[in-house]
Amino acid sequence: MRGWIGRGLALAMAGAALLSGCASPPPPPPVPQVSAEAPQRAALVRAALEEWERWGRPTVDGWPEVLPQEPAPENYSNVLAYWETVPEGPAVIQRHQQTHDALMTGLMEMLPVGAPQVLPSISLWSHPAWSAAFVSYVMQRAGVPGFVFPPSAAHSFYVDALLANWSSYPEGAAFRPHAPHEYAPRPGDLICADRSISPLYGWEERLAEPGQFRPMHCDVVVASGGGLVQAVGGNVLGAVVLRRFPADAAGRALPPPWDKPPFFVVFENRLDTTR
């Protein structure tokens, strides 16, 4: 525990130094592309973009290794809010709060009297991964019922639920799976990649292993066109980040580089057309 706290103190101090540097102005948000006839899609896009705004609009192209600037440590409260959405959340929140309190005590003891307060680096809360909790949170904020999109701390488990709904009732399923090379994502859809050592390359492969954990990542598509698929995801380099993926002339996401997790499914959001 003492070693962990020491590492946390070092990260907190390093984060403070990074935040003191000059930051380039954030890019403008994507222009909303969801029509009034698709209020459910619009609500999900709005929820994702609102969270992105809270984090300072970090934006990257493709698959960088680091962000241009570490997000503010005050975003810690946002991470806790995402965890509150999923069943596994209370235990994670309790551990985070205990660690946070211990770090704050250590920082208070290290700083001279009258020095500005230093908060623990946001990167400390990247584990356990909260990207699925983020997607669950924005779904809840958009008013998507839990029986339609079951909140989960693991992408693979809500992916299983969406695939099961599609398999049993394709006409009425709220999310329809598509092969990424066959379907151009639209705002309000989900685009998912498999981060496993031996990844899936098609959603049909997942049907053979329901309930088995796989490290995955899904983002909410917020804009498309112009040779890009723009999507917002959580815990991307420790933050809520808008990523711009290259797309072909038809708007379909191009395959990631060979050393990056492959896209294996795009879930078409049909919340506005199903009941």
Task: Name each region found by the language model.
Residues P25-F147:
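N-terminal capping segments
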Residues S152-L237:
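...with weaker cross-activation on analogous glycine-rich loops/strands in unrelated enzymes
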Residues G15-A16:
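Residue-level signal for mature regions of secreted extracellular proteins and peptides
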Residues M1-L11:
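Bacterial N-terminal signal peptides that target proteins for export
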Residues N235-R275:
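Low-complexity, Gly/Ser/Thr/Pro-rich intrinsically disordered linker/tail segments
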Residues V60-W63, V148-P151, W203-E204, L242-R244:
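Short, solvent-exposed loop/turn and secondary-structure capping segments
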